Every structure is written in structure tokens, then in C-alpha cells.
């Protein structure tokens, strides 16, 4: 409709069609995120040796346009090879790095990623210089559809960190 009737209707109609298109795109993102969330356990791949350095590099390449636009940068330290579902770890890094870039203040985003040996495996850390999270909301942000900001302030579906939590738990870990 927007292509067919662009400029042929009055301003109100154009705004209505534009708003409808935006809502359709938002609904499409929501459905895709819900499918991703539901498939974490139902369409999971077996755990294989997975190079986390390679995964982070892939995510940085995927997010390069956003990084350039925001003058942001990702600073990974050497990361381990772990037994994991590689596609899910890719999604995990993409969501965490993407959030670090999105939830920024006036400074260009800078995301640091590292890992250190822990008792039962590895402790990964994704830190940034963004707006931060009030400690009182630390658990709430990992619940599905929970947002701390309006869609107008920061776009998104409110599912990304719930996906992260489900992936981490499937891999026997915790996220905070």
C-alpha cells in the first residue's frame, strides 16, 4: 500500500500507512524473537568445540554498520574454545554486544569482552560504558517481555536478554 499510494493520499493517510508499516515490522521482529526463544531447547544443536574468538569476530562483522554509525568499538580479550552450541553462543554474543551498543549515553559505546577460568568452567564478562542497569532491576531484565525503557527510548521486543538467559542456562551457566 505504501508504495502504491505514496503521495496520492492526504498526509493523514500517509502517516497511517507509515505507522502501520512500522507496526508490521515490529510485530515481525517480535515473532522472530519468540521463535528464537522457543527454539533454544526444541531445535538445539549438540555441544561441540566452539571458538569464542571466532564467534565474537562474526558478531562484530555483523554489527559493523551500527558500530560505525555510533563510533563504537568492541574490545575482546583472548577467549577460550568451549563445548557449546555454536549457533546459540553466536546469538548470545550478538544480543549482549547489540544491547551494549544500543543502551549507550552520549559517549561512543565501548564493549569489553573477556573470560577467565572458574571452578566449573569459564566466567565470561561483557562490560560496556553505557547507561548501566539499576541493581534493583538486575533479575527483572532477564524475564521475557520485561523492559526498563519505552520502545520510543530504545527499540526492541523485550525478549533479547530472556533469550540470553535461556541459552546460558542450557549450557549449564548463570547470567547476571
Place the predicted regions along the sequence by residue:
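Short beta-strand-loop-beta element adjacent to the nucleotide/active-site pocket used for signaling
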Residues: 111, 115-124
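Short conserved segment of the HATPase_c
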Residues: 133-145
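Detector for a conserved hydrophobic position within an alpha-helical segment of the HATPase_c
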Residues: 168-169
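Glycine-rich ATP-binding loops of the HATPase_c
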Residues: 172-176
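Short alpha-helical segment of the dimerization/phosphotransfer core of two-component systems
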Residues: 22-27
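A conserved beta-strand-to-alpha-helix junction within the catalytic ATP-binding
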Residues: 46-61, 112-115
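Short helix-loop "hinge" at the ATP-lid/N-box region of the Bergerat-fold HATPase_c
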Residues: 100-101
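Short alpha-helical Gxxx[C/S/T] motif in the catalytic ATP-binding
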Residues: 160, 164
Amino acid at each position: 500500500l505504501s508504495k502504491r499510494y505514496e503521495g496520492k493520499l492526504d498526509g493523514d493517510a500517509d502517516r497511517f500507512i507509515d505507522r502501520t508499516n512500522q507496526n508490521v515490522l515490529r510485530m515481525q521482529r517480535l515473532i522472530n524473537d519468540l521463535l528464537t526463544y522457543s527454539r533454544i531447547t526444541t531445535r538445539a544443536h549438540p555441544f561441540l568445540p566452539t571458538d569464542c574468538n571466532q564467534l565474537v569476530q562474526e558478531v562484530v562483522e555483523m554489527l559493523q554498520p551500527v558500530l560505525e554509525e555510533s563510533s563504537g568499538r568492541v574490545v575482546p580479550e583472548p577467549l577460550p574454545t568451549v563445548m557449546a552450541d555454536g549457533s546459540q553462543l553466536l546469538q548470545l554474543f550478538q544480543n549482549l554486544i547489540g544491547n551494549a551498543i544500543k543502551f549507550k549515553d552520549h559517549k561512543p559505546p565501548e564493549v569489553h569482552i573477556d573470560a577467565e577460568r572458574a571452578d566449573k568452567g569459564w566466567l565470561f564478562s561483557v562490560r560496556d560504558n553505557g547507561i548501566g542497569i539499576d541493581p534493583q532491576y538486575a533479575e527483572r531484565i532477564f524475564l521475557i517481555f520485561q523492559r526498563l525503557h519505552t520502545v520510543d527510548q530504545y527499540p526492541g521486543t523485550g525478549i533479547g536478554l530472556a533469550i540470553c538467559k535461556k541459552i546460558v542456562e542450557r549450557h549449564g551457566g548463570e547470567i547476571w
